[in-house]
Every structure is written in structure tokens, then in C-alpha cells.
Amino acid sequence: MKITDLKPTIVWKFFHQVTQVPRPSKKEGKMIEFLESFAKEYKIAIKKDEAGNLLMSKPATPGMEDRPVVVLQSHMDMVCEKNNGTKHDFDNDPIETIVDGEWLRANGTTLGADNGIGVAAELALLASDDIQHGPIECLFTVDEETGLTGAKALKEGFMTGDILLNLDSEDEGEIFMGCAGGKDTQATFHYEPVPTSDKMQYFRIDVKGLNGGHSGGEIHKGLGNANKILVRFLFLLKKKYDFVLCSIDGGNLRNAIAREAHAVIGLHPENKEDVRILLNHFAADVENELKHVDPSVQLAMESTDRPEYHIDNATAEKLIYALHACPHGVIGMSHDIEGLVETSTNLASIKMKEGNTILIGTSQRSSIDSCKIAIANTVASTFLLAGADVKHGDGYPGWAPNPDSKILKIAQETYKRLFNKDAKIMAIHAGLECGLFLEKYPKLDMISFGPTLRDVHSPNERIEIATVGLWWSHLLELLKSIPAK
């Protein structure tokens, strides 16, 4: 079975088209062209702002003209992650999709259902002539995944809707009424390159096989973080043996839990077998710790060519200690909503850069703004104590739940009517663009909902096929049921 054989046909048709268009964050040009061509083909009114956000407008169907304007919103960019050994150019290659039982996934890469399925649903709605709805506006934002820059750049008056349906949630049957705010903290270490010695032997230490995942929606699962595992081993090594750190690299994206990390070290030949034994014992500990969530974790040590330089020992020691001390994971749970993560932090990436610098990327989230700032300052303090330069990003606001939301009530009623069961009303620890929309449009009545996705922001990303039809049915029933102004 192929993606084009799936039901509802019109949604999967457009999702397939979306997967054929490269759309990395900050490189959405081809996607913008695709959407503009769609609007031209279907004679849909369209406008674009300076950031590249697109808004398509469609009049009400006959008899629905007195309904309020509804904005449907999704982001057009996708997280670009692939497995080691997977050959894929995200700037140019289409995503290869595979129907795998009850799920649709990609072939060794992220699928881009986050948030391509939302884009597809909007296009299906715009292209259809047999769906009842009031006046609608479909908003497609850019660069949600790496900075929310599209939502931040949105100007007052660009859209006119009174109600906004965000299509960027990942559990069918759950309706979201709030989300966390976020802030990034970056640390930069400066080091002196020291010529390596031919009296040492050099080895690459790898951490791989982890699932990774979304650092908001999946932080509560206790998934392994490759950066933390690698640094934990280097810390143990530092306590027992003399070695030099030549290079270190781990993770990629601020909003993804690191799946892979590696370091190149130099050892005295007489210590190499003892270090292998130490690594094997450590690997056994990690495998035991993660057996329920990351059973495929692997740690490996292989000989490698002698690098030209290593990081000066004083900086390497401070780097290892600071990374080991840097908090990662859930910091606190909500006292207002049972089961909701309130505050968390993600040690996202470790990258060696030009100018003899090492850049550490971290991301903090909280549904309470003061807690978000507090954990960002905790992370900053860890690196400041080690002599690093630290800076914070601007961050983005959370979306405070509104229990009196009219659209929430309609969404609950329509779900119950369709499926004879109650939808779960939730807040999400992940960041959504909704908080930024409220800054510019404070009277917006909003909810977020979507089909079931798993392992987003990783090559294991997949979408549960049957839930797309359920979500689509709910969306259509909801649009039909919104009362006159």
C-alpha cells in the first residue's frame, strides 16, 4: 500500500504533495512557491508578509456567510534529521514515505508530518467544494521549528479571524488549550589548540542507537540524551586516566533530544585496554538504565587517525565538568494540571566552531514565565562558573489556558457527538505559536488539535494512519457547527 491509497483521499493526496517539497526551517522558499502555485490553480486569494508567512482566504459556503471568520494555522517548515548512513539531501530531495502497518513513516529521515499534515488538511479544505464552513483564512507560518520567527514577525491586521484552530498537536482525541513558553541559552567556550603527541593513541567514542524525540512533548519519558551519556563517560575517564580531548560533537536541534554524540580522545597506550573495560562497564550501566525507553543504545570505542590538535587541558576539564553538571530533563511538574510537565531543560547540542570555540545549545521550557527564567539562569550559571560566555535568546511566551473558551466548548461537543466519548482537554509542554498570536491578537479564541504522531523531530517520526480520518472528521464537524456571530 502507498500513501496515495490511504483515506481520507484528499488529505493524504496533499500530504504526499507536501512531502515532495523540500522545506527545512529557514529554507522554505520551495514550499512558498508550491503554496503560491496551489492558490493560483484553485483561484484562492493569497497574500504574503515580509517574513514569508502566507494567508489564503476562502469565502463561506452558501448559507454560512453569517459565521465568524475562522483561521486554520500550521507551519510549513519541518525538522530535518536523518540516521547515520542515510543518504538524503533535505535541501533538494523529497521525503520517501513508507506505509508500515498502522503507521506512515519515512525511510531513515524525519517524516515532516509535524506540521505537514496540518498544511495538507488546510489545502484539502481550500480545494474542496463540498465542505460546509463559514469564511476561513488559512495561515501558513515559516520557521516554527528553529525560532518561531514567522509567528514572531506576524503583524496586526494580517489576518481577520476571531477564532484560530492550530493544527500542530500530536494526539488524536486530545484538545489543547495551553502550552509552555520557551527560552534558549547558549554557552561558548574558547580554547587553545595544542599540537597532539605521537606518543599517544587516538580513539573515537560514540554514543548512538537512541530514539531521540521532541524536547517538549517527550521530555517526560526519560529518554537517553547522547550528550549527557558521552560527557558522563568522559567525566569518569577524567577521574581515572590522563587523556586529551581532541574534539566533541553531539545533537543538532534545540528542540530535539540528542540521539548521537561522539568525542575523539588521546590515550597513553598502556591505558587503552583499561579504558575499553571502563567503557564496557559503563555501557552496561547505561543499557540497564535505559532498557525500557532506549533498548538499542550503543557505546563504541574505535581507533582513529591522530588529529593535528587537541583542546587545551584546562578548557577541556572545565567543559566536561560544566556539561556533566548542566541539568537536563524534567525540572518540575504542574500543580494545576495533573501529569503536565511544568518546567524542563534540554542539553541539545555540542558543536566545535571556527575560531577555536565550542558552542553549547540548550533550551528551557515552562508554563510559568518566572520558572522559565529561573531554569535558564540555572543553566547559564553552570557555564558561567566554568568561564564560558553565555547568552539567552528572546524566547517566546506560553499560552495561558482559557477554561471559558467558546471554541473549546464547541470542539468538546462535536467530538462527543461524533465519537460518543469525551475528548481529553489538555495543555502541552511543547511550545506552540499560539502564545505569540495572542500577543498580536489578544481577543483570539484558540484551540490546538491534530492526529497522532510519535517520535517527532527524529527519524523514527511516524503518524497513525487511522487517526487522520478521525481528526479530519472532527475538523469538518467543528467548522460546520460554529454558530452565527
PLM regions: where:
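Active-site metal-coordination/substrate-binding segment of hydrolases
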Residues: M64-T146, A151-D162, K199-Y202, N313-E317, ...
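His/Asp/Glu-rich mid-to-C-terminal helical/loop segments that flank catalytic regions of hydrolases
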Residues: G157, L223-K240, H268-K272, K318-H324, ...
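Glycine/charged-rich beta-loop-alpha catalytic/anionic-binding loops adjacent to active sites
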Residues: I95-T109, N211-G213, K416-K421, T452-V456
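Active-site-adjacent substrate-binding region
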Residues: N225, R232-I248, G393-G395, P401-L444
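Acidic/His- and Gly-rich active-site-bordering loop/insert found
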Residues: K2-W103
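Acidic, glycine-rich active-site loops and adjacent beta-strand->loop/helix elements
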Residues: M76-M78, L139-G147, S169-E172, N211, ...
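Midchain, well-structured core segments that form catalytic/ion-binding scaffolds
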Residues: E102-R105, E145, K152, E156-R365
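Zn-dependent metallopeptidase/amidohydrolase metal-coordination segment
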Residues: I3, P8-V11, H335, E342-I358, ...
